[in-house]
Amino acid sequence: MYSKFWPKGGLPGILHHYTETLVTFEYTTTTTRKPHSLLFVGGLGDGLATTSYLADLAHALQPTEWSLFTLTLTSSYQSWGLGHLDRDTNEIAQCLKYIKEYKTEKFGGSASSGKIVLMGHSTGSQCVLHYLSRPNPHTHTPAFDPYLEHVERMPLDGAIMQAPVSDREAIQWVLAEGLGDRTPAEIRPVFEKLTSMAREAARDADAGTDVLLPLAMTSLVYPAHTPLSARRFLSLTSPESPESPSEDDLFSSDLSDEQLGKTFGMIREQGLLRGKLMVLFSGADQSVPAWVDKDTLLSRWRNATDHNGEAAIWDENSGIIPNASHALSNDDQAEPRNFLVNKVLGYLSALVKA
């Protein structure tokens, strides 16, 4: 459905190739010097500029020294069911390297003079946390992606996560409440069959193959016409959680403090974040089950990130956006969108002054 917030007439900018086949679009004008960069990564199903509040951010950043970038990944649009976080963050690292070199060449000065911030929405937040918390470069080459080339990830001046929701708890919410006109009684048997099929197929994945699940079944649970591999299905649904969470299960509310220490708690050790991590949770996120206590969850993430006060990585302006939906795309989201934009502008302004 077309959002009333999409800008009519388009927005100006520059299309860049950061690899031969992947691009990033820079919202910018020629009238303002813009040495600083904010790279935005969307969630599952997103692509170039598909998150509607980007238009609000682009307008708000026009008079500042910041330019906003959006990008395509191999996993963009309907390819998320074949992707994985190592490949996503390798490509994000390539894009950031391109942006840093482009800005340094354009505006001069040292390579450290222009600030770089990475912002993720939804599953894009998983990319942000994966980028910051995993070994640098990544160390594992999966059998299903044998030509994956790991690259060294550059340190970031700042990082923002918006709507960091659990894909596992989102599907549990669907199983409890239904989806659209489908009841839980209709969805649950299909989901259980998919889980059984995926587990069986996962054994083949270890041998180097990645098996697609039937579209006729996955379309009852996930968006239609989207290829979904058994491997990614299990990573998103993480049936062994909370004891043994999958790669994609980073934000579930039932993960132990020990598990959070392996993700949020590793940001300090990896040393890839020079500044602060700001986390913005949507107060009325339709992907978050009613049983999740958002304030408690944010507090636990903060404690893990800051090692119970030993570090100061968590940004004080993190918090819940009142009445915000998941992507702030509904027609009643003007006030939450303004709240979000002001939070981001304040964060970026403080970063430059620091």
Curated annotation (Swiss-Prot):
It holds the Pfam family DUF1749. Keywords: Hydrolase. The keyword GTP-binding does not apply. The keyword Cell membrane does not apply. InterPro entries: AB_hydrolase_fold, SidJ. One of its GO terms (molecular function) is hydrolase activity. It is an enzyme of class 3 (hydrolase). It catalyses: fusarinine C + 3 H2O = 3 fusarinine + Fe(3+). Its EC number is 3.1.-.-. Displays specific fusarinine C (FsC) esterase activity but does not hydrolyze triacetylfusarinine C (TAFC), which has the same core structure as fusarinine C. Both extra- and intracellular siderophores have been shown to be crucial for the virulence. Subsequent to chelation of iron and uptake, FsC and TAFC are hydrolyzed and the iron is transferred to the metabolism or to the intracellular siderophore ferricrocin (FC) for transport and storage of iron. Belongs to the sidJ hydrolase family. PANTHER family: UPF0613 PROTEIN PB24D3.06C. This is Fusarinine C esterase sidJ. It comes from Aspergillus fumigatus (strain ATCC MYA-4609 / CBS 101355 / FGSC A1100 / Af293). The lineage of its organism: Eukaryota, Fungi, Dikarya, Ascomycota, Pezizomycotina.
